[in-house]
């Protein structure tokens, strides 16, 4: 479809969506005041978006429009994948509408798909324009719904290609140093592959908005990699060098957006024994090559990231033991942000799987509330906890994407209430109680 025709179609669809929204829900949440940087009219306006403020870091806090900005967000890694085909695109729209109805403001999602089904990058430096337009649509639609995006740029895991696909490409072209997946981090040819991808993505001109990604404030931050690990070098030096090189490269192209590494938060060789003791369980080796404090101190990294999965990491623990661990884990990392790092800390993934023996929906309510309480308490003190993003939310009819952690909000009323409550609490820190009720309307009524 030609760009011009695509723009016309998108304007029509945007207008139709707005009319339907008004017709069916007069009390719909209005995030225009909560996120004044994002337009709500049908169709994304280049002129309007280009003049909008970016989320920025000041010391250990995030700011937007001169006020501290705290994130109640979610993960939906699949947005680009479902935006490719016309018959699945409505699920993307549905997810954004549902999120906004709960006051959620930030979504973390994949901006990569390497060499697999619906691949964005077909081979090094060669991209599928059809899939790139799907990512354009995700960014434009996020803007229309008043949602910011954290876009992850690669995967340590094999899903959606991952670092293994880059290694396979180098091996097939006869330039790879080794077949080890960890060569992604030290092989010069593979590092060059990744830089080509980074430059192409950052300078991509959205066919719907006319903005290059590096100029679009809808994007809150870039994430170098989802859960980077380099087990072949437990010293952490290989992974550290890669993070330093790639973060500097991103910033050489895009100085407007925030940047994070994407780490899970494991303490490494440069950490004290006290910190190492916080790592989850004796079975969890300190040889992943990750080093939370060292990695997060990198000059070009704006905020630190933490993940927490107590049922995966403490498989035989009771609910109380998982709760104690999770509380200690998040609190320790927020304290790092307050102290040694002097940077914001975001819990970019947290979850509890329904596939664990003895699981009850109420267990999620208990553990997720604990995460939200830590973030809210830190926000009230002006601390380093910048927010938390649940893993993961899904739209109805997406069983094929369920991974044990997926939550369809309409099927979990108590979870919807909990998420809404957190949205209101963080809005109250930013705007005051009365301001929060005005900004989020029916969510905080």
UniProtKB/Swiss-Prot annotation:
Catalytic activity: Random hydrolysis of (1->4)-beta-D-mannosidic linkages in mannans, galactomannans and glucomannans
GO BP terms in the entry: polysaccharide catabolic process
Record keyword Cell membrane present: no
Catalytic EC class: hydrolase
EC code: 3.2.1.78
Binding site for substrate: 110, 226, 309, 391
Localisation per UniProt entry: Secreted
GO cellular component, one term: extracellular region
Molecular function as annotated in GO: mannan endo-1,4-beta-mannosidase activity
Gene3D superfamilies named among the record's database cross-references: Glycosidases
Glycosylation site list: 181
UniProt cross-references to PROSITE patterns, sorted A to Z: GLYCOSYL_HYDROL_F5 (PS00659)
Record's keyword annotation contains Transferase: no
Active-site residues from the entry: 227, 349
Main location: secreted
InterPro entries, alphabetized: Glyco_hydro_5, Glyco_hydro_5_CS, Glycoside_hydrolase_SF, MAN-like
Tissue: Expressed in stems and seeds, and at lower levels in roots and leaves.
Signal peptide: 1-27
Keywords: Glycoprotein, Glycosidase, Hydrolase, Secreted, Signal
UniProt xrefs under PANTHER family: MANNAN ENDO-1,4-BETA-MANNOSIDASE 2 (PTHR31451:SF45), PTHR31451
Similarity section: Belongs to the glycosyl hydrolase 5 (cellulase A) family.
Protein name: Mannan endo-1,4-beta-mannosidase 2
Originating species: Oryza sativa subsp. japonica
């Amino acid at each position: 479809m030609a760009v011009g025709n695509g723009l016309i179609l998108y304007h029509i669809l945007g207008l139709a969506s707005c009319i339907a929204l008004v017709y069916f829900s007069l009390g719909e949440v209005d995030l225009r005041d909560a996120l004044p940087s994002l337009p709500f009219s049908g169709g994304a306006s280049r002129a309007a978006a280009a003049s909008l403020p970016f989320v920025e870091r000041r010391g250990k806090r995030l700011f937007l429009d001169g006020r501290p900005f705290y994130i109640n967000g979610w993960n939906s890694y699949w947005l680009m994948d479902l935006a490719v085909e016309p018959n699945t695109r409505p699920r993307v729209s549905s997810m954004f509408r549902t999120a906004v109805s709960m006051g959620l403001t930030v979504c973390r999602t994949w901006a990569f798909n390497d060499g697999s089904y619906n691949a964005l990058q077909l081979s090094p430096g060669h991209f599928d324009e059809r899939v790139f337009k799907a990512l354009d649509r995700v960014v434009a639609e996020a803007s229309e719904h008043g949602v910011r995006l954290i876009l992850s740029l690669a995967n340590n895991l094999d899903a959606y290609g991952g670092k293994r696909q880059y290694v396979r490409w180098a091996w097939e072209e006869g330039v790879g140093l080794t077949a080890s997946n960890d060569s992604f981090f030290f092989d010069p040819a593979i590092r060059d592959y990744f830089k080509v991808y980074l430059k192409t993505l950052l300078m991509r001109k959205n066919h719907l908005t006319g903005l290059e990604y590096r100029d679009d404030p809808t994007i809150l931050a870039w994430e170098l990699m989802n859960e980077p690990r380099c087990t072949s070098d437990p010293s952490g030096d290989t992974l550290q060098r890669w993070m330093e090189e790639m973060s500097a490269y991103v910033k050489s192209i895009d100085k407007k957006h925030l940047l994070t590494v994407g780490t899970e938060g494991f303490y490494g060789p440069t950490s004290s024994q006290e910190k190492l003791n916080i790592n989850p369980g004796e079975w969890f080796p300190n040889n992943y090559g990750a080093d939370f404090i060292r990695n997060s101190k990198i000059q070009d990294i704006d905020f630190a990231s933490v993940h927490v999965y107590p049922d995966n990491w403490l498989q035989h623990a009771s609910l109380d033991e998982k709760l104690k661990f999770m509380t200690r884990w998040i609190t320790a990392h927020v304290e790092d942000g307050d102290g040694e790092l002097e940077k914001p800390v975001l819990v970019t993934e947290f979850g509890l799987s329904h596939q664990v023996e003895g699981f009850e929906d109420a267990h999620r309510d208990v553990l997720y509330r604990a995460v939200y309480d830590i973030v809210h308490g830190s926000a009230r003190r002006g601390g380093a906890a910048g927010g938390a993003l649940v893993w993961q939310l899904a739209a109805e009819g997406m069983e094929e994407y369920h991974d044990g952690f997926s939550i369809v909000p309409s099927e979990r009323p108590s979870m919807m209430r909990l998420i809404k409550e957190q949205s209101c609490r963080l809005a109250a820190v930013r705007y005051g109680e009365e301001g929060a009720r005005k900004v989020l309307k029916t969510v905080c009524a």
